[in-house]
Structure formats: structure tokens, C-alpha cells
Amino acid sequence: MASHIRGNLTEEQLKRIEANRKRALERLQQKKKKDAGEHVPSSTPKSTSTTTTKETGSYSPTKTLSQIVNSDSVQVSSKFVEIETDGSVKKRRVLTEEQRQKIEQNRLRAIEIQKNLKQRENQKDDSTTSSKPVDNIRLNQNRPDSVVSSTKKFQPPPIRKQDYIEFDFATMKDTKGGFLQDEKTNTQGADEQTLQDWKNKQRELQKIRELPPPIDLQNIPRCRECQSMEVDANLMTNFNVRACRKCIKALPEKYSLLTKTECKEDYLLTEPELQDTTLLPRIEKPNPHGYSRMQLFVRFQVEEFAWKKWGGPEELDKEWERREENKVKRKEKKYHDQLREMRKRTRAEEYTRKLRDGKSLGERHVHDWSSPVNIDKHTIKRRCIDCGIETEEVVI
């Protein structure tokens, strides 16, 4: 009865109160040290921590992780975690063999890069010191390192002054001041030219070539029209046509030049006939409208060959009209074929639509009229819901 009276405590209760007081005091000290930034070791007393068993109600002492680690009798080690002296647990990183090899390779590569950078810096220092005058080297030795490092980047290269300049005229080339270029010379010899290059060169020479002066005045070539001795060299050399320049300008319907396209379209000549130079001589010039070379023919030679082929200008006109009619017929036939195909597709689509709607192919359409709409006083308008046809009815 005396133990339950206020103010009278047992020894066991006094011990518990004293232990709680000490524990609170230690917590307060740890908090102050933590706020001050000092390291706080684990200070849980071994003797003060007690547990009570349910069966007997007695108290048994317990130990924390730091007490177990600090104890001499227990050895704690793990492959995956590290336990510090203060009882904190850190996860240990486990590296594979491949990761270790990669780390070692990166370390060796970094060492090699550092060595190369040092060698380059040493070479730069050697080159700069060798190019500097002796007086500058002596003066720079007395200057502080900070000044030398700051002015090193902006120091201009040394100027080597000499009394004369040496030139090797054997290796010197005239560049024309950079404004003029030498004419392109053919580095290939005559034997190394292709056959097509040789033919093109010969054609160019034929265009420029002029007729030699006459030796025999009686047998000199004269113009076919006016018997003049001033024969055009181009027509005489390339087409074997004797005509002076005055007659060429006066008679363009006879001596003008025609292109290959005009010969095909106007005179209905074929490609093999135009390619045969024995039948129709020609000259070639650069085409201003494309990359292929332009072929030119004399008009009266083309007309003579066309009259011989078709039998005269009237027969040529008939052949041209016949080809134009055939061209129109082919165009109309193509149009009708396309129209027939379109009708077939439309009919097939109509059959497909009827089958999809569940109607037979031979079924007659019956209009499903909508309600009438009044247009004016005596006229109404109706519309089929299925096909969309509209009718107007007059109401009398």
C-alpha cells in the first residue's frame, strides 16, 4: 500500500526516472552539437536501454547497430554494404570485370593524352625561344612570370631583316598578277586524241577555211545565179554549192539553212536519211537551246531530195494531209476508248451500288417524292429522296 502513495517511489522507479533524465540530457547535448556543425558519435548507453518481457514483466538490456559494431566480440562484414564507425550503412558498388577493364583503358588513354599535350607545349616553347632574339631572352628572364604569361599571347613574330632576297628563276612561274590565265593547251599529243575530237577539230577548220586565190581564171568557180567569182567559202567547202553572198541574201528560199527538226516536220524525212552525208551534206554547230550539236542543211538540196522521194510538192502535201488526218483519227479513237472505259467503270459502280443497297439489277426505279415546297402562289416543287431529281408542278 505504501508504494502507491504519492511521494513514495520504489528503487526501481527511481532508477528508471534517472535513466530517462540522463537520456534526455544526452539528446539535448547531441542536438546542440548538431546545430553547431560538430560530429556527433552514437552515444546510446549500453546499460540504460532496457526492454520488458511480456511473460515475466522484467527488463532485459538491448544493443543498437553501433554497439554491435563497436563491440570486440562481434565482427560485421558484408559484400554489398559498408558499415561506418558511427553505425551508418552505405551501399557498396560492385563492378564487373568489363567495367574494370574499361576504367583501366580510360585511365591509360588519359595519361597518354596528358603526355602528348606536355610534349606539344615543350615543342612550342622551344620554337618560340629559338626564334626570339638573344636580347629579348635576357630581358625576359628578369621579368616576373605573371607579366611574361600575359604578354606571351600577343607577342608578334620576329622580323628577319636581310640585305637581299634570293629567287630561283628555274622554278619561278609567271602568274600574270593573278588576273590573266594562260590559254588551255592540249597536253595530249596527236596520237592520244580520240576519233570524235579529231572530227570536231576538222569541222571547225572547215568552217574557218577560206578558198585559195584562183590560178586559172577560165576554170575558176563562179556563182550559179550571177556568175560572180566571189563564191561563199562555207557553202563551197561543206555543201559543194557555188553561190555568192549577195545571192544567198537575195534568195533565202533557196540557200537558207534548215535544222534537222524542220526537215523532219516539213519535208517528212527520216533520221537515217538525214544522217547519211552522201545524200544530204550538213554542218554542225553548238546548239543554243541544248547540249546536243545543231545540224544544218541547205534548203534547195533538201527540197530536191524530198521531191525525188515523194514525187513532187503536190504529193508531199497529200502525204502531209494524210498523216494529219491519221493523227486526228488516232486522237479521236483514243478519246472514244477512254470514254468507253469511263462508261464501263460508271456502269460497274452503279451495279455495285445497287447490289450494296439490296436491289436487283433489272429493278425499275420508283421515285420517293418529298413533301411539296411552295415556290409561289401556283407553283410547287418536289424532289426525289433517292436519286435527287426535282420537278415543278403548277397548281390551277
Curated annotation (Swiss-Prot):
Superkingdom, natural source: Eukaryota
The keyword Transcription is annotated on this UniProt entry: no
The keyword Cell membrane belongs to this UniProt entry's keyword annotation: no
InterPro entries reported for this sequence: DNA-bd_dom_put_sf, XPA/RAD14, XPA_C, XPA_sf, Znf_XPA_CS
Pfam families: XPA_C, XPA_N
GO BP term (any one): base-excision repair
Keywords annotated in UniProt: DNA damage, DNA repair, DNA-binding, Metal-binding, Nucleus, Zinc, Zinc-finger
Chain intervals for the UniProt region annotation (Disordered): 20-101, 116-156
Comp. bias regions, Polar residues: 63-78, 128-153
GO molecular function, one term: zinc ion binding
Ranges that cross the membrane: none
Record field: compositional bias (Low complexity): 41-62
Major subcellular site: nucleus
Function comment: Involved in DNA excision repair.
Family of this protein: Belongs to the XPA family.
Protein name: DNA repair protein RAD14
Organism listed in the record: Candida albicans (strain SC5314 / ATCC MYA-2876)
Upper lineage: Eukaryota, Fungi, Dikarya, Ascomycota, Saccharomycotina
